[in-house]
Amino acid sequence: MLPRVVDIVEIMAADHTSSNAPDGFIDAGLVRRRRVIGSFNYYNGLGTPALNDLTIIEGTSPDNRRYDLPVTDLRSLPTPLSSYTHEKHGFQIIHQPLPIDPSPTSVHDHKIMTNQYYPAMTALLRQHLGARCSIVRKHSLRDIPDWNRVGMNPEVGFEIPSLAPFSIAHSDYTPAGARGHFRAIREPDWFVENDTETGSTTDPERASFLRLRREIIAAEDRAIAAAGIGPEVYVEGRRPQGGHWDWDGSNYDGPRYGFFSIWRAWETVKRDPLAVMDMSLPVSSRVEYAPLTRTYKNRPGCVPFYYSENAMIRPLALRRRDSGYEESHGGDTAEPAWCYLSEQTPEEVYLLKFYDSEALVRRGRGEEDMRLLCPHTAFQIAGQENEPVRRSCELRVWCIW
């Protein structure tokens, strides 16, 4: 059995404040950084995954590998939890009292979710991010221990009432994958077919989102044409090429927009916690992504057929082995920057970034000060197998500034 906790004593800079101390309290001297050893699943293939290779998501691919890695408990660090930002770290932690009854009956009531929870969460994003528009694409509920009960069928997009924790390191979309979903929206049917027209959004919100979406796509198309990239080319059985699929996001002058997940536990998390990667740390710049291109058919409110792309996280090069981890030598850390919130409560809401057009614009200017996305995954800690099943929810939300 893996050891559950590894305690490391570090000397922290004197100007750090404690996330567990009153405002203004300065930690003196030693700070104990708490880490656990977690079990992580990675895609470990060296090539580009084949189109629609859903065995990677199902966990049956021969290229998937399990690694035992250290995970830092954010509560043990001197950094206040409220100071993490999606622009610097890839994620934020927002405190919000539960806006709805978190009972299973309540959260599985579609009308309660769309008419009460959705508006509360989009208002939260407008408040904390300063976005002028935020629209929910969909939500997922995770409240079963594993996939054995329902079977995993990624082709239907997990359109089932209860899901298990998703335990493979990933970010939901590559930049082209996020744009693929955004461009697939079919006007004017999208809100009606996703049951978010009545009670979930207002007439001005819907009109603003669709108008800004058209402006965004027009600005992207101008930048793509200026870069000399030809139109998108689709050949059955092959990954798409051209158009926004070959564009790096630079020289875009339209409204800034992003794609986020709002991740919340309905009860205090006792097992299968969510790990997030701190993208502000230098080691995170070495993370490699494997693009898993997928086809989507007959999705509500979308064009009949389109492509998107998931970003599967590869293990760091020094770590490509069947299991375990090795301490680094020569001062160069090889440990991924995984962290988590121990016993995360329903009031502690993660905001995870999937995509940010501004990050790509800055990258095109040679600036690396804004994070594009946040890798994340459920992971397992030995000894927690018999704890209550994790009950959680994630909303995928478009934000436009």
Task: Describe these PLM feature segments.
Residues 25, 40-43, 117-118, 340, ...:
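Aromatic side chains
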